[in-house]
Every structure is written in structure tokens, then in C-alpha cells.
Amino acid sequence: YRQSKFKHEWRDQYLVTHVIYRLKKTYAPDLDYGNIRASLATKNIEHPTAQQLRDVIIEIRNAKLPDPKVQGNAGSFFMNPIVEKAKYDALAALYPGMPHYTIDGEHEKIPAGWMIDQCGWKGKSLGRAGVHDKQALVLVNRGGATGEEIVNLCETIRKDVKQKFGIDIHPEVNVK
């Protein structure tokens, strides 16, 4: 869903109104993503059912993300950048403990939220637009923010991350 013709060449031509999911018949959960395994351990669940896994994921997301009915937001605003291993190694030497996810032998994914937090943006605002206090990937409307204010905050954060880490982060949200 992150990359498709609907986000690129068909962006202004089509509106998706329905989807069909093709689900696997065999249940094979990925428990190594984020805090899933730790959350399951606190509940003494070793082999979760699909329902238990769903409940844990919803619990994790609700703890980190603001309710859009209460505070305007579009969820994760930035994509996590994938960098070459040499770039990651150089940054890891400067920032021990920097989180990352190995993509393959030549690439690492660095959490954009971590970089935004390291730039001091978590919980901060620029005008009426701000960065959520629990998840730096989420930009929020503090009340009455315009699209221009959200874009200005986005671009300011992108500039700060580029200056500090030498990495371009890109919005996941389509902004016009």
C-alpha cells in the first residue's frame, strides 16, 4: 500500500472506493515487528491466536497514536528511509544504539520517528501544527492548523533531519 500506481502515475486520476484482500489460508504471524513479542510476553502468550495478535497490535497502536476523532492527524506522516549499509555504519558509530531493521546485506532501514525525536521535535509545535508527544512520526493539528502549516512543519522537520543525519525523509501522506 505504500507504493502503487495510485500514489504515482494515477494519483490525480482515480479514487479507490473498494478493495479485495487475498488472505493466506495458513496462519503464520510475524512476531518480530516492533513491540509485539514484548507485549505478548507480558500477557504470557507464547503462541498467539490471530485474535490475540490482533488485540495486541490494536493495543500497541492505541497507546502510540492519537485518535483522529479527538486530535486531527493522518497517522504515520513520514516513511522510514532505507540507506546503504555504509551510511548506516557511519551513523551507528555516531549514535550507538540507533534502531534499525536489516533489509538485506547492503541496506538498512532507519526509523524516521527516531531521527525526528533526536532532532528534538517530539511533542513540539510550529504554530498550530505539531509532532505527537508519543510518536514522532505523527504530525498533529493542535487546533485550527491549515494545510500550509502542516506542510511548513513537514518541510522544517525534513530539513532538520537532513542537516543532522544527512538523510532525506519523505512524507508518506499525500499533501497538495
Describe these PLM feature segments.
Residues 161:
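Conserved ATP-binding N-box helix of the HATPase_c
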